[in-house]
């Protein structure tokens, strides 16, 4: 699958226009307070571009997974349809107002906001309430998504998408609105995601290594299958490594293993060999008898895990080997941790991979891409995120791209000629 470049907000005429921007403000909120505003700050360049060029912004986002009302439901006597206190975007309106240094209007019902939209003047900002307060946003029926999209599209003139994290979902705000308006532009965040993934999938600087970890082979089958035709090296870590180890006849103690995936692991290793992809698996391990932290976990001397022990991180010799592989590459894509990095005693492998990628990027011009989710969290925790070429904002979306799938929320945007 090739990823086609899309027209960006720089190609759109926004002066005197009302610009509908699908952002990703799905931020953690505790007791009405935002605990991490990274996603809000990430959307600022796109919003500021519209304001600077003399347009106004209508911001749309989801937050959490509220149940959602139907558009046909009667309006309650008090409040709005579908409202859930835990998922309101009202705290986000206050935070974005602080960050932009200007008042941000808030429409308490995203499907009853025409009066708010009509009052917008150039350089004004309006945030609509959580689009998932309506079930039609993520309905499996296209006609239901389209009905909601038509209402939202009527508020504005231009559609911009900056929500890569939900690009793998067909929804009223991701695919419905650009369909109604006949065009869609990528915001700066979305553009960066598309540009980096298109480079790594279509024309990466070589050699290219894929570092794949996490718990289950079954979660990464399609990714491995798709990437084997594109990469030069494959580095495997995390619990999934032990299904491969067992498939090769190694002793894995009581480490996690998907017994029903042993044949699949063998066939993936065979396919790698046929495609001249060199595969690296752990040669030593950090183990414990139970799945819990230990002051001094056992470090094995060999590739075999002793009976009664489970491997919970890669060992020092494996770390050295993986650092060396990353060091000889020009591009690296990382999806999934090397161990149970949430426990400090099993975080060395994951953090070492992050450091090798960060150092390679800063010193040797490595193109480093972190595929969202746990890997992005690990890169942040290790302090290396700032040193990477690109840390993806979408776990599910980046995984589907690496699996060779088309993302509906990207495909719908207008192609760059």
UniProtKB/Swiss-Prot annotation:
Gene3D superfamilies, per the entry: Phosphoglycerate kinase, N-terminal domain
Binding site for CDP: 214, 219, 238, 336, 341
Pathway(s) where this gene product acts: Carbohydrate degradation; glycolysis; pyruvate from D-glyceraldehyde 3-phosphate: step 2/5
UniProt: ATP binding residues: 215, 220, 239, 311, 342, 374-375
Cellular component, GO, one term: cytoplasm
Annotated (2R)-3-phosphoglycerate binding sites: 23-26, 39, 61-62, 64-65, 132, 168-169, 216
Description of how the protein assembles with itself and partners: Monomer.
Name of the protein described by the UniProt record: Phosphoglycerate kinase, cytosolic
